[in-house]
Amino acid sequence: LSLDLPDKDYEWMQLSGAWSRERYIKNRTLEQGITAIDSMRGNSSHEHNPFLALKRHNTDENAGEAIGISLVYSGNFRMQAEVDTHDVTRITAGINPEGFDWKLEPGESFQTPEAVLVYSENGLNGMSQTFQKLYAKRLARGYWRDKARPILNNNWEATYFDFTEERLVEIARKAKECGVELFVLDDGWFGARRNDRAGLGDWVANEELLPNGIKGLSERIEALGLKFGLWFEPEMVNKDSDLYRAHPDWILQTPGRNTSHGRYQYVLDFTRKEVVDHIYGMMAKLLSESKISYIKWDMNRSITECYSNKLPSDRQGEVFHRYILGVYDLYERLTNEFPEILFESCASGGGRFDPGMLYYAPQGWTSDDTDAIERLKIQYGTSMV
């Protein structure tokens, strides 16, 4: 998007923060020069949401002019306003140009992410209502778009990695007594996952913990009158996993350099179709065999060493964008095959809380901060778009 405005008499508003402090409202007055937000993390990020608003100095919740711009994209982005020597303001929004190249052969085309532009004469409330109505009816889609969402209980903060099948069933039983409708099993149910150092990428049940497998556990949960949900982190892998031992070249890594990890995990190369196909196959098999009504899709680290062994050196500038296209492809295939499963997007809380995700997952994890008072600023900022 590129938009010119004839003056600079605006306040810039952005939604910024950090983990557990996502989307705090930040305001500043536009002056000559460049005001910008961006992400180079491989996701839209906790630090800056891909949204900005320009509002007149007298604009409040219900009166005054406001212009909102929201980027429908989940990867690296940049949004900026530049005031020139004539006090003309130019707004641009799109893929972050830093580190980005895309090679086009003759006859080929490239599709850029879409941006949504909203103009309001009825203040910030008029702007936010327009965004929300548009996204609720024209961007979100599928079986769950217009349905009330189930009240859920997630075991993570009750057990972390320390659970057994019997303990999970007991938690679910008590949750049912409290009016909960959906029980969600979080991290730790798969492979050799007894802590965060192993197992990612091996999406098969740990039979020592779950002797009846996910199928058996899901049936026991449903017998209590609850629906059953499951946590995945499809884009990541631990070195201590069968997947990594079989395919050490399937991660993003720069040749000749040490590959850094976050939470002891590495990023799978989702630019490669065979990698996405493999993860899809494991997830689809499990979803087909078990009574699963909900998926929490997590992403717990940023992308570093963004280099694909599959692409030639003159196409490495495409990796970040190709990666997020791979994520979208996996979402598209799973949501098409399992249309009645409720997908919730998550990235260490609200690290990928953007309209691009909303198209595939009609529910988003707002933040890992569940303190009622601390959430007030997060909820207020989130309500803007």
Please give the residue ranges for each predicted region.
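Polysaccharide-binding surfaces and accessory modules of carbohydrate-active proteins
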Residues: 1-82, 98-100
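Conserved mixed alpha/beta catalytic, RNA-binding, or beta-rich assembly cores of soluble enzyme
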Residues: 81, 95, 122-124
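Short acidic, Pro/Gly- and aromatic-enriched capping/linker segments at domain boundaries
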Residues: 85-105, 340
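Short Pro-Gly-centered flexible turn/kink motifs
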Residues: 102-121
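Terminal connector regions
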Residues: 118-150
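Aromatic-lined carbohydrate-binding/catalytic grooves of carbohydrate-active enzymes
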Residues: 144-281, 294
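Active-site and adjacent substrate-binding regions of carbohydrate-active enzymes
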Residues: 160, 191, 206, 212, ...
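Glycan-recognition surfaces
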Residues: 238-277, 321-385
